[in-house]
Amino acid sequence: MNPADEIVQIVDEQNQEVAQVSRRVMREGCLIHRACYILVFNRSREIFVQKRTMSKDIYPGYLDVATGGVVLAGESYEQSAKRELAEELGVHKVGLTSHFDFYHEADNNRVWGRVFSCLAEGPFVLQPEEVEDGFFLGMDELQSLAAAAQFTPDGLMVLKRFMAE
């Protein structure tokens, strides 16, 4: 199925379900939706950073500190997180820790997100349609890179809040 045709859950400002529409309609209308964000760490406490493909419908080619994606209609945040880990990284049967929910709004994106973390060493099987490359970075390296490269703004916001808690 073309990702633009996937049916996603639309919510209101209080994260209450209001409709189900295609991803295309959601993006075109900048409708509030749900997404999961998974911070993937290795045993050295480095975080997995992925480079998004140029075909992504939002932030193409950007770096992202979170694996994850849009919650589909009928899915819970946790079901979505497990699906996204399997699709994007080939990671199955990993323990997820839920951290916090948040609302993020930008010019082209309005989302209620839930943040998870997990421990996974790799090697990963990257989904070529979504992930161009990926690598683990320590926090100092990540801060240096974030100052010089394009990162997804919601991903950086998630990491900043995660590190503060």
Regions found by a protein language model. Give the residues of each.
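Short glycine-enriched loop/turn motifs at secondary-structure junctions
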Residues: N2, D64-A66, L126-E130
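Acidic, metal-coordinating catalytic segment for phosphate/diphosphate chemistry
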Residues: N2-Y37, R43
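Nudix hydrolase/Nudix homology domain
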Residues: R24, F102, D107-E165
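A short, polar/proline- and glycine-enriched secondary-structure boundary/capping micro-motif
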Residues: G29-L31, I58-Y62, L137-G138
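A glycine-rich, hydrophobic loop/mini-helix early in the fold
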Residues: A35-T67
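A structural signal for short, well-ordered beta-strand segments
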Residues: I38, T67, S98, V115-F116
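The catalytic Nudix box helix
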Residues: F48-V49, A66-S98
